[in-house]
Amino acid sequence: MTQNNILIRRYIIVGERRFSNYWWAIVIFLGSCGFLATGICSYLGIPNWLSLLNIGTTFSSETETLASGIVPFFPQGLLMSFYGSLGFLLSIYWSLLIFWNVGGGFNEFNKKEGFVRIFRWGYPGKNRKIDLSYSLKDIEAIRVELKQGLDAQRTIYLRLKGKREIPLTGIGQPLTLKEIEKQASELANFLQVSLEA
């Protein structure tokens, strides 16, 4: 997403607040609740609530169905509890990342005042706000890096004097080759610097 002006350009970086992260946090939470419920039910020696849903579909007696719905605690119930706890903790962690919006922020290129500002949200603590500011005079080039393979990476870098490179694209934010080329060329034209591959 871009907010354009003649003298100011701002590119919004989404960070952790993507639909896929919401989806996986919810799916992992629901799955872990099922695993935990099964583990707790097996520990207490009561039929699992999921097996009670099958009572009306089987032709055996109700006592056989209830007895077959009890999962032995060792090793199945113990493992189900372990995986459920792990999944629950993972979903809580993922939810906190979404809440904190880790990696979210913006890249601002301001010709009016002559600076580049790169802002990102990090993990809570002393360095929660990552706010970098550079003069436009320090920018040497815009560089595009394309890595092919199973985990293809397409990154736009801002190269400063002294060969320091700062990534401008967000992590986990896949852009098509056409989008990355367009964004990099627009940025190089706006800043009037060279574009390197």
From Swiss-Prot:
Q: What is its main location?
A: plastid
UniProt keywords, alphabetically: Chloroplast, Membrane, Photosynthesis, Plastid, Thylakoid, Transmembrane, Transmembrane helix
Cellular component GO terms, alphabetical: chloroplast thylakoid membrane; photosystem I
Q: Where are the transmembrane segments?
A: 21-43, 82-104
Kindly list the places in or outside the cell where this protein is found, as annotated in its UniProt entry.
Plastid, Chloroplast thylakoid membrane
**Any single GO BP term:** photosynthesis
Protein's job: Seems to be required for the assembly of the photosystem I complex.
- Family as reported in the entry's similarity comment: Belongs to the Ycf4 family.
Q: HAMAP family, per this entry? A: Ycf4
Task: Report what the protein is called.
Answer: Photosystem I assembly protein Ycf4
**Which species?**
Chlamydomonas reinhardtii
Q: Which gene encodes it?
A: ycf4
